[in-house]
């Protein structure tokens, strides 16, 4: 079932928490709402579920406006971060609960409920724990019970609010893989909230990055990493090096070094330069691609590559994090050379286009 979010705004008193949000989610897609605390991601999820009401705008499921429908009428499954299991009920009864409280005309027979719950217990690999109570379960087991309970009523849309946030790292990884496999099998439309970049990019078909009530970028996970649409996305998604400097003519001035850009940007003045660790050119010998001297202050072998922290020698004050391929690990104190050719330049939040981008803009004008 598709979800259409059309010009949603939400205020709490004088505080605007969602600013004219629009997003289309095709049927069967798994979408991550990713952002820091206060970005509006959980509020948006709750509005989709009907647990909060928007100040303006519309929510449509498969073309039908559900904006005024109560949460129970929207027929979505919702999984909370802290499980929200009934402590006095067994695992079996927790999963069955949603079926037992359906209106009489929609309620399955006791035999059908038993069959359904048994199938769900097998699916979430907890059949042997059917008679246990929540207090007797691990965090990962509780989350599986919560997910099975949400799936019991056969929702066409599944919503999850930081479903793995309360679990330890190893259990989170296992449950992420399991949820992705389950999604592939059942093909339900799913939206989940997370602040974990790795979780979002590993599980979701599409990542929606949010900040201060706005959507910064909605894209495939790899594109969000490699082609960030805004400065916020660039800085939020993983580690990035930032250097401050100035563009003058066709050169970038950083500290005591002048680095030729190979073209003269339309913008001239102060800029911030950004490179992810793997975008920094690095070698043991100086060259046109790697002219800037650095000294290794930390080296962390990672198998087929080494993550380095290097200190620029005479041309910048802050250390950089870089990645060097190969098994020949540099040692602390070793002198290397880096290049910044793959950098992105920003003036505040405004991206400074490369020569190719400026030419493309001129041709399209």
From Swiss-Prot:
Residues 3-237 form the ABC transporter domain. It is a peripheral membrane protein. Part of the ABC transporter complex CysAWTP involved in sulfate/thiosulfate import. Responsible for energy coupling to the transport system. GO terms for cellular component: ATP-binding cassette (ABC) transporter complex. This is Sulfate/thiosulfate import ATP-binding protein CysA. It is an enzyme of class 7 (translocase). The gene is cysA. GO terms for biological process: sulfate transmembrane transport. Its EC number is 7.3.2.3. One of its GO terms (molecular function) is ATP hydrolysis activity.
């Amino acid at each position: 079932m598709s979800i259409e979010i059309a010009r949603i705004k939400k205020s709490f008193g004088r505080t605007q928490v969602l600013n004219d949000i629009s997003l289309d989610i095709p049927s069967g897609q798994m979408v991550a709402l990713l952002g820091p605390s206060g970005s509006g991601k959980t509020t948006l999820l709750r509005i989709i579920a009907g647990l909060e009401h928007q100040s303006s705008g519309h929510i449509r499921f498969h073309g039908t406006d559900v904006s005024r429908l109560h949460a129970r009428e929207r027929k979505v499954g919702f999984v909370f971060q802290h499980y929200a299991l009934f402590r006095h009920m067994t695992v079996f009864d927790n999963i069955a609960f949603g079926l037992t409280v359906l209106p009489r005309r929609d309620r399955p027979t006791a035999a059908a409920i038993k069959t359904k719950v048994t199938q769900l217990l097998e699916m979430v690999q907890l059949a042997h724990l059917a008679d246990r109570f929540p207090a007797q379960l691990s965090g990962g087991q509780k989350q599986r019970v919560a997910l099975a309970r949400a799936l019991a009523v056969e929702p066409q849309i599944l919503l999850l609010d930081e479903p793995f946030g309360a679990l330890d790292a190893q259990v989170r990884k296992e449950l992420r893989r399991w949820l992705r496999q389950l999604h592939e099998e059942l093909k339900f439309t799913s939206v989940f909230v997370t602040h974990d970049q790795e979780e979002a990019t590993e599980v979701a078909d599409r990542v929606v990055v949010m900040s201060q009530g706005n959507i910064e970028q909605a894209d495939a996970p790899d594109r969000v990493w490699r082609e960030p649409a805004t400065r916020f996305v660039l800085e939020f998604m993983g580690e990035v090096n930032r250097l401050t400097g100035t563009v003058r003519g066709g050169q970038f001035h950083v500290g005591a070094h002048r680095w030729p850009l190979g073209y003269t940007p339309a913008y001239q003045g102060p800029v911030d330069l950004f490179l992810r660790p793997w975008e920094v050119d690095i070698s043991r010998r100086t060259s046109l691609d790697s002219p800037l001297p650095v000294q290794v202050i930390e080296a962390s072998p990672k198998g087929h590559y080494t993550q380095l922290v290097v200190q620029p020698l005479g041309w910048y004050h802050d250390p950089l994090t870089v990645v060097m391929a190969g098994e020949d690990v540099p040692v602390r104190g070793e002198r290397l050379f880096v290049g910044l050719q793959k950098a992105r330049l920003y003036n505040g939040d405004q991206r400074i286009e490369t020569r190719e981008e400026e030419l493309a803009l001129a041709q399209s004008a």
